[in-house]
Design a protein with these regions (language model features):
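Membrane-proximal interfacial segments on either side of biological membranes
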Residues: 1-253
Length: 253
């Protein structure tokens, strides 16, 4: 496919502004831009319809990049699977550069995986440290997965994502039904907190700590085999159901 570029730029004494249009068969991308001495502002316009909207700002002195993206629908597999472009960029170590400084936020109400919706993903890179903060996604209409204190680290040439995920249960009856939890194990749960380490190279999870309603599970070695069998973001519902039921069997709350 041929790619066409069309520009409409007005140069002024203190600023430059206009549009840059990229087009190919069945697709147009129109950027509105404005440049001053030390800032560049850019955004999409309504020609993209409701599928995608973005706006951003580049500060030149000192350098800082800000970007907000709102998408009508997100393919979660293409975003976080081990073979995705996003994950390949993370593995490339490009973010570990002291000259980079950025904040990127991604929002989408619809996810193409039927069990998830309302994604908010926020990332911040500063001083050679990549952090995911304020990131959350809904599990249907009965739970929220909230990621906090998540940081991308390099250790002995391996790339790790360290952090904590909170499973906030908003409707325990629907939650238990979804995971087919036996009635004898259905307890009055509100929050399950898991501190973890995820190796992006080998797709292996390690669990450092588990809490249920702020009560620490002292010994979860009985879950080690099941946790080691997790295949990163390709983990399926059956594997998670097995781990959850074993965890609830050990919980005396």
């Amino acid at each position: 496919k041929k790619l066409f570029l069309d520009t409409d730029i007005i140069f002024q004494d203190t600023s430059t502004e206009g549009t840059i249009k990229l087009s190919t068969v069945g697709f147009n991308l129109i950027n509105k831009i404005k440049m001053t001495n030390d800032k560049i502002f850019f955004s999409s316009n309504n020609d993209l319809g409701s599928r995608l909207f973005y706006k951003g700002q580049i500060n030149l002195k000192p350098f800082n990049f800000l970007l907000d993206i709102k998408a009508n629908e997100i393919d979660l597999t293409n975003l976080i699977s081990n073979e995705s472009f996003f994950m390949e960029v993370l593995k490339s170590r490009l973010f570990f550069n002291k000259n980079l400084n950025f904040n990127i936020s991604l929002y989408s109400n619809r996810i193409n995986q039927k069990n998830f919706n309302n994604l908010v993903l926020k990332s911040k890179f500063d001083q050679e440290s990549l952090n995911l903060f304020g990131t959350r996604i809904n599990l249907r209409d009965f739970a929220v997965l909230n990621l906090s204190n998540n940081q991308l680290l390099i250790n002995k040439d391996n790339l790790f994502l360290n952090g904590e995920v909170e499973i906030i249960i908003e409707n325990k009856d629907k939650f238990f039904s979804f995971f087919l939890v036996p009635k004898k194990l259905r307890k009055n749960l509100k929050v399950i907190s898991i501190k973890y380490k995820y190796n992006l190279e080998s797709s292996i999870f390690e669990i450092d700590n588990i809490e249920i309603d702020k009560k620490t599970i002292q010994d979860f070695n009985f879950l080690t085999k099941d946790i080691n069998n997790l295949k990163g973001f390709k983990t399926n519902k059956i594997q998670l159901r097995k781990i959850l039921n074993k965890l609830l069997e050990s919980y005396d709350g």
